[in-house]
Design a protein with these regions (language model features):
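Metal-dependent amide/peptide-bond hydrolase catalytic core
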Residues: 15, 148, 155, 161-334
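Acidic/histidine-rich catalytic neighborhood of metal-dependent amide-processing enzymes
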Residues: 98-162, 202-203
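Short, conserved micro-motifs enriched in small and acidic residues
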Residues: 87-98, 124, 181-184, 312-315, ...
Length: 334
């Protein structure tokens, strides 16, 4: 298979979470054709209705190459120029899927076995596919998780801690504000206290960061608002036990902090001869746990263009990624 052609082929299949059926079917066809050529076994791993992980392994999968097949919205099709391939999922992670498949095919052609490919659904929302895969391990000792790291081996990734901050008030005519209670003012006070909280730091992963992502509330300009809500997202490092308590305390008494998501930060191993980096985004690695073996995180593309209208991937990085994945597999099989 040719990595540029396969990358564009995959980009042109819309797979915004949770609409992975078509790309799953396409990968199933590709891997079902690859498997018998080299004595492999292809499997569909049901996650939800019309949503399957796709797995192929050749012998016992000591090393598994894995990434996700879903993307964020909105879909836009592929195009290319001399240096780049553009389109939704180009770097996150259709180009990575293509690089992994091509690398695996070339390894197999050279007699390498005990390798697997695992492509999962739902990473962009809740890692549903990785959670299901973690319940049905296949004995893999190492999992190479693909995300856009500019082909550098990540030493770790920050976690995620998300809250809804909810405030309640009492409606009144805005001409007589003393007769009501403004939920928005309560929310703003709570958010200001949360913004001032010290956040955990880590010697490798750096500082935690906080984003107030959405604010909702109020009914009309001439009505004292009776409800307001904000969503905050913290890219966390280190132990978050104290931070959780501090957020709940800072929100009260005017508001309530409701935790809706937690993904822990992870530290990852390094290998001699690979450039390294640290990433602030979350991945499927915490959802896999250790079910598919020791994790490594590396892939072509820049996270800085992922999720944007300018998403693209360098052709040179796709070619480099094929060689990097082949080299990693050979090292880990030793």
């Amino acid at each position: 298979m040719q990595v540029f052609e396969l990358t564009r082929q995959l980009i042109d299949i819309e797979s915004v979470t949770p609409n992975e059926r078509e790309i799953g079917d396409h990968l199933w066809r590709l891997l079902s054709e690859l498997a018998p050529r080299f004595g492999g076994t292809a499997e569909r791993m049901a996650v939800e209705k019309d949503r399957d992980n796709i797995l192929v392994h050749f012998g016992n999968p000591v090393v598994t190459l894995s990434t996700h097949m879903d993307t964020v919205p909105p879909f836009f099709p592929s195009r290319e120029d001399e240096t780049c391939i553009w389109g939704r999922g180009a770097c996150d992670t259709k180009g990575i899927i293509a690089s992994m498949i091509v690398a695996a095919e070339q390894l197999l052609e050279n007699g390498i076995r005990n390798v697997g490919l695992l492509f999962v659904v739902g990473e962009e929302r809740n890692s549903a596919g990785a959670h299901i895969a973690a319940q049905t391990p296949r004995g893999s000792k190492y999992i190479i998780n693909g995300e856009p790291t500019d082909n550098k081996l990540a030493l770790g990734s920050k976690g995620a801690l998300r809250y809804e901050i909810v405030a309640k008030g009492r409606m009144a005519h805005s001409a007589y504000p003393e007769l009501g209670e403004s939920a928005i003012e309560k929310l703003l006070d709570a958010l200001e206290r949360i913004r001032r909280l010290p956040l955990p730091t880590d010697s490798i992963l750096g500082k935690s960061t906080l984003n107030i992502g959405t604010i909702q509330g109020g009914r009309a300009p001439n009505v004292i608002p009776d409800s307001a809500m904000a969503e905050i997202f913290i890219r966390v490092v280190g132990d978050v036990t104290a931070l959780r308590g501090a957020i709940e305390q800072a929100a009260s008494p005017e508001a309530e902090a409701k935790e809706v998501l937690f993904i822990p930060a992870v530290h990852l191993g390094s290998l001699d001869g690979f450039e390294t980096t640290v990433v602030a985004f979350t991945t499927d690695i915490p959802a896999f746990g250790n079910a598919w073996g020791q994790p490594f995180l590396i892939g072509p593309g820049s996270i800085h263009v992922a999720h944007t209208s300018e998403e693209h991937i360098l052709k040179s990085q796709l070619i480099e990624a094929v060689e990097i994945y082949k080299r990693l597999v050979r090292i880990l099989l030793q």
